[in-house]
Design a protein with these regions (language model features):
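Amphipathic, small/basic residue-rich leader segments at the start of a protein or domain
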Residues: 1-92, 115, 119, 156, ...
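Glycine-rich phosphate/cofactor-binding loops in nucleotide/flavin-utilizing enzymes
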Residues: 2-5, 74, 78-79, 99, ...
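Glycine-rich beta->alpha junctions and the first turn(s) of the following alpha-helix
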Residues: 6-10, 206-299, 368, 384
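C-terminal helix-coil-helix/basic helical segment that borders enzyme active sites and/or dimer interfaces
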Residues: 31-39, 275, 279, 283-286, ...
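Internal helix-loop-helix
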Residues: 53-114, 118-123, 171-177, 296, ...
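A short, Trp-centered hydrophobic/proline-enriched beta-strand micro-motif
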Residues: 123-131, 181
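A short core secondary-structure module
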Residues: 143, 159, 163-208
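Intrinsically disordered, low-complexity terminal tails and inter-domain linkers enriched
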Residues: 149-159
Length: 391
C-alpha cells in the first residue's frame, strides 16, 4: 500500500496567520459567505478581494506573468481552506480564481489570456458559469442550447448564434462574463458535440431572471439566450472540445471549494463557545462530535489527494471522491450542531450562536448534494475510475 504524505510546506502556518489577520481586520463579524446579495456584504467582498490582490494573495498560485503570486498549489490550498473557514469572503470571485482562470490559462488564446487573466487576478471582474439546463443538469453532454452557424450572409459574417436556456447560474445577475456551453456539432458523438464560449453578459439576446431558493440570498438565476452572437474569438479551446474542458474545469471547481474547512471551523468555534457546558453534553453527542472531526480529516486528505493529481487523468475521479466525503460531512455537521443547540441553532444575527452561521450552514448543506453534479453522479465517476472505464 502506498503511503501519501501531504506536506503543505514550511510556510503554511505563517500563511494561515497572515490570512487570518487580514480577515480579522477587514471582514466584519457576522459575514456569512459567498452567496450574499446584501449590498454591504458585496462591498466587503469586493474590497477584500482587491486587498488580497494587492498582497499577491488572490491568485496566489497563478504565474506572475498572469497577475498571480507565483506560489505553489499547496499555498493555494491553504488559502482556500482559510477562506472557507471564514465563510468565503472572496464572494463570487472564487469562481474566476478557482477554475475559470486556470481553464483560460490552459486552453485560451494569447488574446484571451491578455484580456481576462489579469482582470480576474486583480478581482476586477465577476464570472458566471452557463452549463446546467432544465433538461441537462447531471448529464451535461445532453444539453440543448444550440450554437447555429452564422455564415457569410448572416449578421456576424462568421461565427454562431446561440439560443437556449440555462438554470442554476450563480452570480449571473452581477457577472460581467459567462463561460457558456453550447452544442455546435449535434451529429457528433456526445463528447464532441459541445463548445465553450467566453461571452460578455451585456451581449444582445441575454436575459437573466432570479430563481428563489431555500438558500435565501439571491445568487441563483436562469438565463435565456435568444440568438446571442458569438464569434471565433469567443471560443475557449477548439470547437467540439467543450466537454473535455468542462470536465477538467469541474474537477478544479470541486477541489477549490474547501467546505470541510468551514465544518471544522464551526465545530471548533462552537466548542469554544460552549465552555464548561461541553462537559454536560450527552456522551452520544460528544462521540458524534469526535467522529465528525475524524470524517472531516478524511475529507481533507481526499481533497489533498485530488490537488496532488491535478495533472493526472485520475484527477476528476479524485475530486469527485473528495466532494462526496465533504458533502456527507456537511450534512453530518449540520445535524450535529442542530442537535446540540436545539431551536437556538435557527437564530441569526451577531447575537446568535456563531453569529447565525449554523442555520446558514444547514441550508447550504442540503443544496450541496446536487450542486456541481449530484452525489450519485460523483459516485458513478469514482466507480468508473476504479473499474478503469475512463470516458
Amino acid at each position: 500500500m502506498t503511503t501519501m504524505d501531504y506536506d503543505l510546506g514550511d510556510d503554511a502556518a505563517e500563511l494561515r496567520t497572515r490570512l487570518r489577520q487580514l480577515i480579522a481586520n477587514h471582514v466584519p463579524a457576522g459575514f456569512l459567505g459567498a452567496c450574499t446579495d446584501d449590498p454591504q456584504d458585496l462591498a466587503t467582498t469586493e474590497s477584500f478581494c482587491k486587498l488580497l490582490a494587492a498582497e499577491g494573495l488572490l491568485a496566489l498560485a497563478w504565474p506572475k506573468e498572469h497577475g498571480g503570486g507565483g506560489g505553489s498549489i499547496w499555498q493555494q490550498t491553504v488559502l482556500r481552506e482559510e477562506m472557507w473557514a471564514h465563510h468565503e469572503p472572496r464572494g463570487p470571485q472564487y469562481m474566476g480564481i478557482n477554475w475559470v482562470g486556470p481553464a483560460i490559462m490552459r486552453h485560451g488564446t494569447a488574446a484571451q489570456k491578455a484580456k481576462h487573466l489579469s482582470a480576474i487576478a486583480a478581482g476586477e471582474v465577476v464570472w458566471c458559469q452557463g452549463f446546467s439546463e432544465p433538461e441537462a443538469g447531471t448529464d451535461l453532454a445532453s444539453l440543448r442550447t444550440r450554437a447555429l452557424p452564422d455564415g457569410p450572409n448572416g449578421p456576424n459574417g462568421t461565427g454562431w448564434r446561440i439560443t437556449g436556456q440555462k438554470v442554476w447560474t450563480s452570480y449571473a445577475q452581477m457577472a460581467s462574463w459567462c463561460v457558456l456551453a453550447a452544442c455546435t456539432h449535434p451529429d457528433a458523438p456526445k463528447p464532441k458535440r459541445l463548445t465553450l464560449f467566453l461571452i460578455p453578459m451585456d451581449r444582445p439576446g441575454i436575459t437573466v431572471r432570479p430563481i428563489p431558493s431555500m438558500l435565501g440570498p439571491h445568487h441563483l438565476n436562469e438565463m435565456f439566450l435568444d440568438g446571442v452572437p458569438a464569434f471565433p474569438g469567443d471560443v475557449l479551446g477548439e470547437p467540439g472540445d467543450g466537454w473535455r474542458i468542462m470536465r477538467e474545469a469541474l474537477a478544479f471547481e470541486r477541489v477549490g471549494i474547501a467546505r470541510y474547512a468551514r465544518c471544522e471551523s464551526l465545530l471548533h468555534r462552537l466548542r469554544t463557545e460552549l465552555g464548561d457546558d461541553w462537559d454536560r453534553l450527552p456522551e452520544s453527542i460528544r462521540i458524534r462530535w469526535v467522529r465528525a472531526l475524524v470524517d472531516l480529516r478524511v475529507a481533507r486528505l481526499l481533497a489533498y489527494r485530488a490537488v496532488s493529481l491535478q495533472e493526472d487523468p485520475r484527477a476528476g475521479a479524485a475530486a469527485s471522491a473528495a466532494r462526496i466525503a465533504t458533502t456527507i460531512c456537511d450534512q453530518q455537521v449540520a445535524e450535529l450542531l442542530f442537535d446540540v443547540l436545539g431551536p437556538a441553532a435557527l437564530d441569526s444575527g451577531v447575537t446568535a450562536p456563531l453569529h447565525g452561521a449554523i442555520e446558514d450552514h444547514w441550508r447550504y448543506a442540503q443544496a450541496a448534494t446536487v450542486a456541481s453534479g449530484t452525489i450519485e453522479v460523483q459516485r458513478m465517476l469514482v466507480a468508473r475510475d476504479v473499474l478503469g472505464e475512463h470516458r
